[in-house]
Amino acid sequence: MPMYQVKPYHGGGAPLRVELPTCMYRLPNVHGRSYGPAPGAGHVQEESNLSLQALESRQDDILKRLYELKAAVDGLSKMIQTPDADLDVTNIIQADEPTTLTTNALDLNSVLGKDYGALKDIVINANPASPPLSLLVLHRLLCEHFRVLSTVHTHSSVKSVPENLLKCFGEQNKKQPRQDYQLGFTLIWKNVPKTQMKFSIQTMCPIEGEGNIARFLFSLFGQKHNAVNATLIDSWVDIAIFQLKEGSSKEKAAVFRSMNSALGKSPWLAGNELTVADVVLWSVLQQIGGCSVTVPANVQRWMRSCENLAPFNTALKLLK
């Protein structure tokens, strides 16, 4: 297709003459053969390169930390989503052996505070319709470690209390003066929805729930556990209260399976030593009575081991 011809802007080999302004620094010719910096622009590019390098270095550090954080979150996510995560944890708690229950009792002043001239008195309100067996077991264990002044009272909100519950602490010998005891343990049978414990109105609020009170009382024995084992024990206590005691038949069956698996690896639920988890779970099993779920073999063996101990055996007699 024919087109009209346009004259060249510059002809021959004559260089192109363009008047450039003097208010800007000169840039290199992108079509030229030389790729060196333009005259007068070196200091600008050097400063620009240093700032870019610093920015890139910061960006690399941030990205590296983000990748590490993502890897850690992915690892935790896989651990949580694993069905047998709780059972796998029991394999790593063998590194730190817990202290035995019979040799290490805490100084009560370090836990309950120092009160000159006054007996440290723990007051528990419990409903006789649902006696907290775990607290009665712990009372017997406390008596083996400390000089305990034990008393039982009946609140006016309760019309009648069975004779065996009124004598749940046995015949108390109070010939010694009050100041000779290390700890006071007062049980009041009262019409309360949940078991309550009061120790010091000035320094602490009441503790509610059989599991929470059992945790507090068991801490007086001075057992020490690593973080993993302590978490496992707390988990068993919560399972006893919220799943085994208050859960459905399916939840109870799941608890028995978990207990059977754990007791197949160790004589007690959290290792080779008796813990508060064993006390609370045994108590709840006795309270729920004839459960429709079949009790596995390892759990039956564990229950016999508990009942062979005097504190458990004494508490068990209260149900008869």
Swiss-Prot record:
Could you tell me which residue ranges the GST C-terminal domain spans? 220-317
Q: Where is this region: Interaction with PRKN?
A: 82-162
Q: What is the effect of changing residue 238 to R?
A: Nearly abolishes interaction with EPRS1
- Quick one: where's region Interaction with TP53? 162-225
A Gene Ontology biological process noted in the UniProt record is: type II pneumocyte differentiation
Q: Which GO terms describe its molecular function?
A: molecular adaptor activity
Q: Which CDD domains match?
A: GST_C_AIMP2 (cd03200)
As for PTM, the annotation reads: Phosphorylated on serine residues in response to UV irradiation.
**What is this protein for, i.e. what is its function?**
Required for assembly and stability of the aminoacyl-tRNA synthase complex. Mediates ubiquitination and degradation of FUBP1, a transcriptional activator of MYC, leading to MYC down-regulation which is required for aveolar type II cell differentiation. Blocks MDM2-mediated ubiquitination and degradation of p53/TP53. Functions as a proapoptotic factor.
Miscellaneous information on this protein: Accumulates in brains affected by autosomal-recessive juvenile parkinsonism, idiopathic Parkinson disease and diffuse Lewy body disease.
* Related illness: Leukodystrophy, hypomyelinating, 17: An autosomal recessive neurodevelopmental disorder characterized by atrophy of cerebral cortex, spinal cord and cerebellum, thin corpus callosum, abnormal signals in the basal ganglia, and features suggesting hypo- or demyelination observed on brain imaging. Clinical manifestations include lack of development, absent speech, microcephaly, spasticity, seizures, and contractures.
- What quaternary arrangement does the UniProt entry report? Part of the multisynthetase complex (MSC), a multisubunit complex that groups tRNA ligases for Arg (RARS1), Asp (DARS1), Gln (QARS1), Ile (IARS1), Leu (LARS1), Lys (KARS1), Met (MARS1) the bifunctional ligase for Glu and Pro (EPRS1) and the auxiliary subunits AIMP1/p43, AIMP2/p38 and EEF1E1/p18. Interacts (via N-terminus) with KARS1. Interacts with EPRS1. Forms a linear complex that contains MARS1, EEF1E1, EPRS1 and AIMP2 that is at the core of the multisubunit complex. Binds FUBP1 (via C-terminus).
PANTHER family recorded for this chain? AMINOACYL TRNA SYNTHASE COMPLEX-INTERACTING MULTIFUNCTIONAL PROTEIN (PTHR13438), AMINOACYL TRNA SYNTHASE COMPLEX-INTERACTING MULTIFUNCTIONAL PROTEIN 2 (PTHR13438:SF2)
What is the protein's given name? Aminoacyl tRNA synthase complex-interacting multifunctional protein 2
What is the name of the gene encoding this protein? AIMP2
